[in-house]
Structures are given as structure tokens and as C-alpha cells.
From Swiss-Prot:
Lineage, top ranks: Bacteria, Pseudomonadati, Pseudomonadota, Alphaproteobacteria, Magnetococcales
CDD domains linked to this entry: SmpB
Chain's role: Required for rescue of stalled ribosomes mediated by trans-translation. Binds to transfer-messenger RNA (tmRNA), required for stable association of tmRNA with ribosomes. tmRNA and SmpB together mimic tRNA shape, replacing the anticodon stem-loop with SmpB. tmRNA is encoded by the ssrA gene; the 2 termini fold to resemble tRNA(Ala) and it encodes a 'tag peptide', a short internal open reading frame. During trans-translation Ala-aminoacylated tmRNA acts like a tRNA, entering the A-site of stalled ribosomes, displacing the stalled mRNA.
Primary localization class, coarse: cytoplasm
Organism field: Magnetococcus marinus (strain ATCC BAA-1437 / JCM 17883 / MC-1)
Highest taxon of source: Bacteria
NCBIfam families per UniProt: PRK05422.1 (NF003843), smpB (TIGR00086)
Presence of keyword Glycoprotein: no
Gene expressing this chain: smpB
Protein name per the record: SsrA-binding protein
Family designation: Belongs to the SmpB family.
Biological processes annotated in GO: trans-translation
GO molecular function: RNA binding
GO cellular component: cytosol
């Protein structure tokens, strides 16, 4: 089975501490699939919520299909995510008890299906973000020093 990356939420790893990852399918309309094939999907600032024992992806953008007609889809509509009932029940427990968030990390093709990799995440504090930036800068500096010495 081949995996082809469609979009990635790069800010998610900076703003959140990812505790666990889950793969979910998405219910899409025809023009949405065509727009995704054209690379017009954005995961930034989107999240997933549980509503009546179902999981929905909110605030994710799939741009209008250029060659669509009057029946083109809404770019920011809520989209149902497909998971097993047992997984959804576990997510409900994690979100309610521990105050965690469900955020999309990546979107990719798995065969002919579009999948979302969801992260169960805890928001980072400002000092955690600073520490992450400091560590990343140190790693870059270390690599630069090692490169110049060889």
C-alpha cells in the first residue's frame, strides 16, 4: 500500500505535545476529492471534535474545485471522520478527562482513499515552545560546527 503525502500540519508539533496518533478516513464529496488531487488542502488551524458519538473535522480547508459547477463544495464545511466506535469512545474519554485536543497532523493517500493522521495532543505552554526553539537552534548550530570541522 502506497502513502502519498497531501498536506502536513507543521505548526502542530510546535504548538502541541503529541501523545498518540490515530489514522482516520474522511467522508468527502466528489469535487473535494478532485480539489485534493490538485493539492488544494490545508490543515493549519483545524481540529477534530466529538459530536453525538461521531468525530468531525472542523476548520480544515479544501479549496473550491476550479472546474466545478454550482454544486461545488463549501471550503470550510465540517467533515465526518471515520473511526471504529471503540476508538471514538476512547477518544471521548481522553478529551473529557484529561483535557486533550484532537488535531490533524498529516493528510495522505492510502491507495485511493484520503486518510488523516490525527494526533491526541496537549497544548504547550509558552516556556515549552521557547525550549523547543532553543533546542532546535542548538541542534542546527551543532551540525554547522561539525560540518565546518570536517
Amino acid at each position: 500500500m502506497t502513502f502519498r503525502l497531501i498536506a502536513e500540519n507543521r505548526k502542530a508539533r510546535f504548538n502541541y505535545e503529541i501523545i498518540e496518533k490515530i489514522e482516520a478516513g474522511i467522508v468527502l464529496q466528489g469535487t473535494e476529492v478532485k480539489s485534493i488531487r490538485a493539492g488544494k488542502m490545508t490543515l493549519a488551524d483545524s481540529y477534530a471534535v466529538v459530536n453525538r458519538e461521531e468525530l468531525y473535522w472542523l476548520n480544515g480547508q479544501i479549496a473550491h474545485y476550479e472546474h466545478g459547477n454550482i454544486h461545488n463544495h463549501e471550503p470550510f464545511r465540517s467533515r465526518k471522520l471515520l473511526l471504529r466506535h471503540k476508538e471514538i469512545s476512547r477518544l471521548i474519554g481522553l478529551v473529557k478527562e484529561k483535557g486533550l485536543s484532537i488535531i490533524p497532523l498529516r493528510a495522505y493517500w492510502k491507495g485511493s482513499k484520503v486518510k488523516l493522521e490525527l494526533g491526541i495532543a496537549k497544548g504547550k505552554k509558552l516556556y515549552d515552545k521557547r525550549a523547543t526553539t532553543k533546542e532546535r537552534d542548538w541542534q542546527r548550530e551543532k551540525q554547522r560546527i561539525l560540518k565546518t570541522n570536517h
